Curated annotation (Swiss-Prot):
Any GO CC annotation of this UniProt entry: chloroplast
Transit peptide feature, positions: 1-66
MF terms in GO: pseudouridine synthase activity; RNA binding
InterPro entries: PsdUridine_synth_cat_dom_sf, PsdUridine_synth_RsuA/RluA, RluA_PseudoU_synthase
SUPFAM superfamilies tied to this protein: Pseudouridine synthase (SSF55120)
GO biological process assignments: pseudouridine synthesis
Domain S4 RNA-binding: 101-208
This protein's UniProt keywords: Chloroplast, Isomerase, Plastid, RNA-binding, Transit peptide
Organism: Arabidopsis thaliana
Name of this chain's protein: RNA pseudouridine synthase 6, chloroplastic
Compartments (UniProt record): Plastid, Chloroplast
Any Pfam family: PseudoU_synth_2
Amino acid sequence: MASPALTGGYRNLTAPVSLLRTLASTRVTTPLFRSNKHSPRFISSPKRFTCLSLLKTDSQNQTTLSSSSNSGYHEYNRLMPCPAYNLPPRIEHMVVLEDDVLVSEFISKQLDLPPLYVADLIRFGAVHYALVCPKPPPTATPEEIILFEEVTSPSVLKKRSSIKGKTVREAQKTFRVTHTNQYAEAGTYLRVHVHPKRSPRCYEIDWKSRIVAVTDSYVILDKPAGTTVGGTTDNIEESCATFASRALDLPEPLKTTHQIDNCTEGCVVFARTKEYCSVFHTKIRNKEVKKLYRALAAAPLPIGIISHYMRPKNMAPRLVAEDSIQGWHLCQLEVLECKKIPWPDAATEKKHDIEDCGWTSKEFAYECTINLLTGKTHQIRAQLAACGAPLVGDSMYMPAAIAEMGNPDTNPYGKAKKHYTMEENQKETAVAEWIDRHGKEPRVGIGLQACQISWDDDDGEHFYEAGTPWWR
């Protein structure tokens, strides 16, 4: 989305390279730092130029910068071919201090990155901007706070025509930089995900074979496990939407209408037009879309409706409680069928990259058909784990379920209901310890498939099924 502060144009940059101040050089390491996409935890890198250092141009308009190799960072070339591993996250936050700055050139010079690498980052959707700098996190240094106050002071903002008619909060909303020829004005905030999270699985899949249906309005994809539906904050290139669009040689890229977890396989609906995208979103809001799932659980589940309440924090793991807690969201699913089947053998698990999460009894598993009544993130995974029947291969929720089976007091929201009798500080400690019992997100797949999706339109019923799940 373009704005007067960030526009495209094929003209030479005549102004000198802009002055730059770095808000923060972020290197987030897990599991020491937990973050969500709205409020990441920040630490300043000691190997990069000092935070908030003012990089000045000399008389020849040349900026002095340390090279990536000298700074201790990875040596950069191109984002392709896709590596089999991810580099540690590196997120750079910057504020432009001069007008008429070519964003791609600015990033290349200030972060000492090859121009082609920056072009790749922009193509991947890893570069974001806001007209006004967002508020720094609580971990910001005094110098960072001073810079923020300088570039967002009312006397400065009232002179910027690009934000007239907008509230400060509206002007702080971030958008993607979509072209290498976009320009920025003074005061523009830039966030660069230098090491986007990669998805090598995308290059291993025969995408045409995963297409279930193609109509004038939408496409149904049997999504492979280990892929994202529409991409991530730092990578929209390596996604189901992009690769399915290419497989079908479509003139316009497919549009995301709903999500399923990366580790889940099965039916996903992509809209071919903005109009149908809006139509399908409305159907989802009105609960007119029916979704059935096949779940491979480690223990049996009762037939019928299972209800929990989910903590409203938008971060994993998702915590659920059996009893209603003020502000928590009701989650309901209906188990329609639960049948005992052999646990997948080691060769099958290895073939599909299913992780061994420590479940001891592996003679039988339980294939359940589930009608999802509410559509919360991680809902089936979190609810089944809370029932003592985590999904096979779920490296995030199965370790916590195992811990609770060994000691019910481990879960402050479980059957022991410890949170009722705790002081506030004790509760916070217990919740933090319970979160730590959970593991990392699965690398590829788990025992979960979106097996059916259906809805009605003016032209009748639309009903689609996914293929055979990996465990059969």
